Amino acid sequence: MIFYKQRNAHLKPNETINYKDIDLLRKFITDQSKIVSRRSNGLTVKQQKQLAKSIKKARILALLPFVNKD
């Protein structure tokens, strides 16, 4: 029998993702400023698409960096 680990998402099911919410978006970005995959963060397909669009929009508006220089 196979047991799957239940993933804990940082989002509630009905919570919307906004590009202005930088603290929330930073939870889904690695140290190298890459977007974390859906497998790792436990989001649904719809939430992952919204997240990717919001992160990309925030990068274009210079709210998030494209690459961390640390």
Swiss-Prot record:
Gene3D superfamilies the UniProt entry points to: Ribosomal protein S18 (4.10.640.10)
UniProt KW keywords: Chloroplast, Plastid, Ribonucleoprotein, Ribosomal protein, RNA-binding, rRNA-binding
GO MF term set: small ribosomal subunit rRNA binding; structural constituent of ribosome
Main localization category: plastid
Keyword Plastid: yes
Statement: the UniProt record of this protein carries the keyword Ribosomal protein: yes
Example GO BP: translation
Top-level taxon of origin: Eukaryota
Compartment list: Plastid, Chloroplast
Gene Ontology CC entries for this record: chloroplast; ribonucleoprotein complex; ribosome
Similarity comment text for this entry: Belongs to the bacterial ribosomal protein bS18 family.
Subunit structure of this chain's protein: Part of the 30S ribosomal subunit.
UniProt protein name: Small ribosomal subunit protein bS18c
Organism: Gracilaria tenuistipitata var. liui
Lineage of the species this protein comes from: Eukaryota, Rhodophyta, Florideophyceae, Rhodymeniophycidae, Gracilariales
